[in-house]
Amino acid sequence: VSAATLEEGPLQGPSFFLSRTVLRALALEHRGAYGTARPHPHVVIDGFLGERLAAGLAGVFPGADDAHWKRRDHVEQAARLGQLQRKAFEGVHGALRHLLSEFSGMSFIDFLETLTGVQGLIPDPHFRGAGLHLTLRGGHLALHADFNRDRFRALSRRLTVLYYLNPGWESAWGGDLELWNADLSRCEARIAPVLDRLVVMAHGDNHWHGHPAALECPEGRGRAAVAAYFYTAEASPDAPEAHSALWAPARS
């Protein structure tokens, strides 16, 4: 039994890949702004994948009627759809699944490490709490600081990446990502969820953010985002000393 799912016709690979060269240039260009941003380190990069690719990804983003969504409706977050990773993104278009894989790949990790200065970043192939998110009309996400640990892998949360897929998004619809200062006295940055915009944010227990006002987009539209979280491991005093390969003695 094959572990792969193949479509009919000639074998075809993904139609896009993230360029390590371009990503490094972007990281060097933006790392100063990332480190000095207020209220906490973050950066906004527009035109990340290019309009043609971004529009194509937006066109295959799962609609609100997709059976695999899990809907959240409570005080902190309402009319928000997510959790497609519970089914390993079954039924999600291959281009979006490939984007998620690219966000976990070497070129993107190198980009994040150069941009932020955080070394040894570890992606989450299970996309716990991340993956694809869709907020519908009337939905919101209250101000919050993100969870700080991956309990399953004993890792510390370091970065959040958000990539928006909302063509023709209008400011009157709301949905701006708000970044608030540590004592919650004021909003210091607002980031509209427009098409092809990448946001990278540092994690912190006082890094308050959300989109707390109810969305006023038309029925049939939603606030679509791709999210990925990144972690680091903590050194253990019980860890053995590092060594290279141990070669067995030659047998006579």
Regions found by a protein language model. Give the residues of each.
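Non-heme Fe(II) oxygenase catalytic core, chiefly the N-lobe of the double-stranded beta-helix
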Residues: 59-62, 91-95, 100-156
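A structural signal for well-ordered alpha-helical scaffolds and beta->alpha junctions
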Residues: 23, 50, 54, 93-96, ...
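A structural signal for short, well-ordered beta-strand segments and their strand-loop junctions
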Residues: 44, 122-125, 131, 200-201, ...
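Catalytic core of Fe(II)/2-oxoglutarate
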Residues: 2-7, 149-159, 167-252
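Non-heme Fe(II)/2-oxoglutarate
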Residues: 31-115
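Proline-centered turn/helix-capping motifs that create local helix->coil transitions or kinks
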Residues: 65-67, 119-122, 167-171
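Fe(II)/2-oxoglutarate
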Residues: 1-38, 243-252
